[in-house]
Regions:
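Transmembrane beta-strands of outer-membrane beta-barrel pores
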Residues: 40-44, 64-66, 73-77, 93-95, ...
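Outer-envelope beta-barrel architecture signal
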Residues: 30-36, 54-56, 65-67, 85, ...
Length: 219
């Protein structure tokens, strides 16, 4: 699950609502809320990057008094599609939110240059946590939802972050703006994203702009 972190592009062909098998929201006496679900999407675009075609994206979450813990994954039907598994710990109050996400991708990421000038790549093994070899990316988020506009800032602070042209860690960051609106009797959102400085984590882009109008789930 990527909070505002995963923008899906394309028509959602099927929504696998598991509420018929497992209640989508379970309320205990201590007010703990849990949710489970899955989507089948025709294409997976994340922050302007094409990570695959038709994909299954399950999610699981639990929250209590603004504190939340969630798991989200994506598996494509093609062997070349990116596989992903994320864990997010977050806190929100009013419109304010902060979170830390552990992303894991099965693709290798350029993480630096060694003393011989050779490029260093991260491994794609899940349980590998070496400082310069892990496939995990750790990201911090801070944001505020003003109602007509939500603003979120994300920065990678550890793990398989991208690098700048000089081979130094980029602390890759992303600014996301999201605005809801109504059209044709449906609720929609328009998302605008920007990469503020160069980084191989976003394919070397600087100031990448990405927009994605999409239906908004109001369940």
């Amino acid at each position: 699950m990527k909070t505002t972190i995963n923008n899906k592009l394309g028509v959602i062909t099927v929504a696998l609502l598991l509420s018929g098998l497992v209640p989508s929201t379970m309320m205990a006496q201590d007010k703990v809320e849990a949710s489970v679900g899955a989507d089948l999407v025709s294409g997976y675009i994340w922050r302007g990057q094409n990570l695959g075609g038709v994909s299954v994206q399950p999610s699981l979450g639990i929250s209590y008094k603004g504190l939340s813990l969630g798991a989200w994954g994506s598996v494509g039907f093609e062997s070349t599609d990116t596989k992903e598994f994320d864990l997010t710990l977050g806190y929100s109050i009013g419109g304010f939110s902060v979170s830390v996400t552990d992303y894991w991708f099965n693709t290798q990421v350029e993480t630096g240059i060694d003393d011989d000038g050779e490029t260093i790549f991260a491994t794609n093994k899940y349980f590998k946590y070496g400082a310069h070899s892990t496939a995990h990316v750790f990201e911090a988020q801070i944001g505020y939802d003003f109602g007509p506009l939500a603003v979120n800032w994300y920065t990678n602070f550890a793990g398989a972050d991208g690098v700048k042209e000089n081979g130094k860690r980029a602390y890759s960051s992303y600014l996301a703006l999201s605005a809801p609106f109504k059209l044709g009797g449906l609720d929609w959102t328009v998302d605008l994203g920007m990469v503020p400085w160069e980084t191989t984590f976003y394919n070397g882009y600087t100031c990448l702009l990405y927009t994605s109008p999409s239906p908004r789930d109001t369940r």
